[in-house]
Amino acid sequence: MRLFLFILLTSFYLQAQTHFRINQVGYLQNENKVAVAFSKVPLTQKVYLVDAQTDKTVLTPKIKAVTNGNWGTFDYYYELDFSKIQKIGNYYLKSGDDKSTIFPIGTKLYAGIPDLLLRFMRQQRCGYNPELDVYCHQKDGYSFYGPMKDTTFVDVSGGWHDAGDQLKYLITSSYATAHMLKTYELYPNKFEDKVDALGKPGANGIPDILDEAKWGLDWLLKVHPDPKSLVHQIADDRDHAGYKMPDNDNSDYGWGANSYRPAYFATGEPQGLGKFMSSATGVSNLAGRCAAAFALGAKLWKYDAEFAARCAEAAKTVYALGKEKPGYQQGNSVKAPYRYNESTWYDDMEWGAAELYRLTGDKSYLDDAKEFALKSNTEDSWTVKDTTDHYRLYPFLNFGHFVLHELVDKDFQKKLESYYEEGIRYTLNRANRNPFKVGVPFLWCSNNFLSSLAGQLILFEKMTGSKKYNEYLLLQRDWLLGRNPWGTSMYSGIPENGEFPREVHTSLYALKKLEVPGGLVDGPVYASIYNNLIGIHLLHPDEFAEFQNNHVVYHDDLGDYSTNEPTMDGTAGSLLMMAHFL
């Protein structure tokens, strides 16, 4: 009888338990502060905001029941608004015996976070890796589809490993480089100088974000060795040969382990060295983003006349290549049908043309940018879609509309603003159908969509001066930092003592248990995607099992590359958002 009562009471407690979800990094003093609570039974007790130092209640937040859908096995959701509290300190939410984790309210809560994101970027470096202090992939690579004979050596060492694997893609590296440069241009006083150009400790008089962006620019210059050539990918999925350290790469492309890797030249035509062929119609997606990066590099390195001139010339020639071969080039695969399926390019050429006009004053670039903007409008954006293939609508933030905005008349400005706002409203409509008010579809790399949506909201505010979507922006940021069903940040090591991805899908963790902070993991995916991917096998019982539902899953597990693999471009693509809140 006692055992029966114990089980009954335990079951009741678990049913009645209230879970709190907050931004673990914390809340800035003057911003809206809205947490989520959920339970399997109605919340009948009051909720208190408690000062963590004194354990005294400072506010009884009004409890607002959320009726716009539930999430998984929990039926009752509530919003807890404590925006009126602005006193700096550490706090927690409490209802009965249930408490949230402690979180701060303050002024400089995001200081240091960009440094962590840049540290993750440094550990993704190829050629020389300062995190590991090793040299790797010095034999990149042997040419394919180039103007020379196949398997001719071309020096394309450097750049970044793309994710947990060790491939290098111009698709993602061009965006990461340009995003960092644009972020610095918008927030020039927000970045520290703690490392040198090689990523080793010690200031060198250059903000670390520019050191990292130049690492990207140097590689972009290598893969555009002459006006008619552009290398778009180094290695392929033959890299996926188990966990390995970058300086001891056992993948074999036909020349032995730890040796040469293929360097694919962009031709604007389908490619593939196996049975899986990519789709391609041109090279404009790559050329446009590279042109934007080079033009920004030429402006930001004015003090280095030789380097600035190289960037300026490269911007012009690669942009011309994009006009000569209009269309898109996708990634290549050999072993499996998984690749970057990008098939948009008007947005990239718009951005490249707009930056070239800013650099040169040549009106032909402005005319091009306006033409591409009208063609891109919202057609190139995931924000007005419910589903799409992996990376088909890349990049996930169209900087082109923002850059062009200051260069055109008011009527054209209104068009550009409307393109951004149409996407924002579409995602907001989706957000209003779930209790966390998250606005993205849970496709592969949903976290990249989220950081990009935050970026679009920030740029819209800069374009228009309107803060009408500011609360929505905060909720997207907060999701990435813990205000989600699993209560976890989506960045490794952030915040330091919080719940964050630990068992990330990388060789560094698998072989060395090395936890490098700052990496944005892929994030939650639809169960329909997760269940149909090849090679996923959880290594441990699911710690978040209670919070999964039948539609969307996330696992902090080394074996889940679909949700817990950190990506280079997603991490770089978060810097705009993080800089905004510094």
Which role fits each region the language model picked out?
Residues 319-320, 327:
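Hydrophobic, small-residue-rich alpha-helical packing segments that form membrane-like cores
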Residues 209-234:
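Carboxylate/His-rich catalytic cores and anion/metal-binding grooves
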Residues 24-101, 107, 122-178, 183, ...:
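Aromatic (Trp/Tyr) and acidic
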Residues 1-17:
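Bacterial Sec-dependent N-terminal signal peptides
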Residues 17-25:
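Short, compositionally biased P/S/T/A/G/V-rich stretches that sit at domain boundaries
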Residues 374-379:
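Solenoid-like repeat scaffolds
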Residues 331-342, 383-391, 435-444, 493:
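Acidic, Ser/Thr-rich low-complexity linear motifs
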Residues 198-209:
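Acidic, glycine-anchored loop motifs typical of Ca2+
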